[in-house]
């Protein structure tokens, strides 16, 4: 059922990097999540970021406006996704 998930990405107009992402999922009762990237770092030329993970209790028609709800502080912070002890090993 994951194949039905819908994803949205917001790219920074100056850096062309994704600042936010949102997704609507249907498994286990479904829901909407909104993630905000922070703590950008590069290791071995690969970009890594952490995320603030928000829950959005919205109607289906509001999904495409989830960023507006974030900007108005209308989303609930569920967790932080923080990458630790990252290592990048070159392959041959």
Model regions: which residues?
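Short, solvent-exposed mixed-charge patches
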Residues: 91-92
């Amino acid at each position: 059922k994951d194949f039905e998930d819908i994803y949205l990405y917001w790219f920074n107009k100056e850096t062309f990097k994704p600042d936010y992402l949102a997704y609507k999922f249907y498994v286990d009762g479904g829901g909407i999540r909104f993630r905000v990237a922070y703590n950008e770092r590069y290791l071995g030329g690969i970009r890594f970021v952490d995320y603030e993970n928000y829950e959005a209790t919205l109607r289906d028609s509001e999904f495409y406006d989830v960023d507006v709800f974030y900007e108005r502080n209308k989303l609930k912070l569920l967790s932080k996704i923080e990458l630790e002890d990252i290592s990048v090993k070159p392959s041959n």
